[in-house]
Regions:
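Hydrophobic/aromatic-lined pockets within catalytic cores
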Residues: 2-3, 45, 49, 82-85, ...
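C-terminal catalytic lobe of FAD-dependent flavoproteins
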Residues: 161-217
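Conserved beta-strand termini and adjacent loop/short-helix elements that scaffold enzyme active sites
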Residues: 53-57, 134, 191
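Aromatic-acidic/polar surface patches that form glycan- and anion
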Residues: 30-37, 121, 198-205
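Mid-domain catalytic core of redox enzymes
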Residues: 62-181
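Surface-exposed flexible segments
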Residues: 9-17, 94, 201-212
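Conserved beta-strand scaffold positions in the cores of enzyme catalytic domains, especially
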Residues: 52, 80, 146-148, 187-190
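Active-site/ligand-binding neighborhood in enzyme catalytic cores
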Residues: 1-78
């Protein structure tokens, strides 16, 4: 895919900077949750009013028809916040949306440091696009270090997890149709990268979740 085939939002994610800073982000304050993002999510799920169902197809529990949301076959008057693939929710009515996925490979080194920065991005001449070294995120001092390489590939239906939306004009036109369809259901809210078909970082994901909660409160 050529650069002109995708939206400027994607190209803008790879800025060219002349600087002595080794970080990717330019925010004045940058941090991670003390116990990590996984524990942050686990802490949310431990709330007594949250019931978690694993290995469950949401589309077998939720049905949409003529502006009415059904849960387990009965009309549901509460609010449904959907964060999955929006085209799956509507049975691919307007076609599938394109995504890129990743294959991850980790390697352990018997030395405290492997690369100069926590994350190093690579151009198209490499099979992998990014290498992360985890001890540099947490500033841990260890005798060994672990890196992870990311290999991008096309996300096909039933194979690979959808990580990156591909915002071509065709895909955005399809998504607009799904968005308009979702708007017909007053108690249905779309949230997150898959449901909104947009690339968002973790901080923005958390912020948008809080903003939606405030709107509903």
């Amino acid at each position: 895919m050529r650069p002109e085939e995708i939206g400027g939002s994607v190209i803008n994610r790879v800025p060219v900077c002349v600087s002595d800073k080794c970080g990717y982000f330019t925010d004045e304050y940058q941090f991670m949750p003390k116990e990590g993002f996984s524990e942050m999510v686990n802490n949310i799920l431990r709330h007594p009013r949250i019931k978690l169902k694993l290995k469950t197809d949401a589309n077998k529990l939720i049905a949409l028809s003529d502006g009415v949301v059904y849960y387990k076959g009965k009309e549901f008057d509460g609010t449904v916040i959907f964060t999955g693939r929006v085209e799956e929710l509507f049975g691919y009515r307007f076609g599938a949306l394109s995504y890129r996925t990743l294959k991850f490979k980790t390697k352990t080194y018997n030395k405290p440091s492997v690369q100069r920065a926590a994350v190093v991005n690579f151009k198209a001449s490499h099979r992998y696009t990014r290498v992360s070294e985890f001890t540099k995120f947490t500033c841990d001092k260890c005798e060994k270090s672990v890196i992870m390489k990311e290999f991008p590939k096309k996300c096909r239906k039933g194979s690979g997890k959808p990580y990156y939306p591909v915002p071509t004009p065709e895909n955005l036109e399809k998504y607009k149709k799904y968005e308009e369809e979702a708007a017909k259901y007053k108690n249905l809210k779309l949230l997150g990268r898959l449901a909104k078909y947009e690339y968002i970082n973790m901080d923005v994901a958390v912020k948008k979740a809080i903003e939606l909660f405030d709107e509903m409160d």
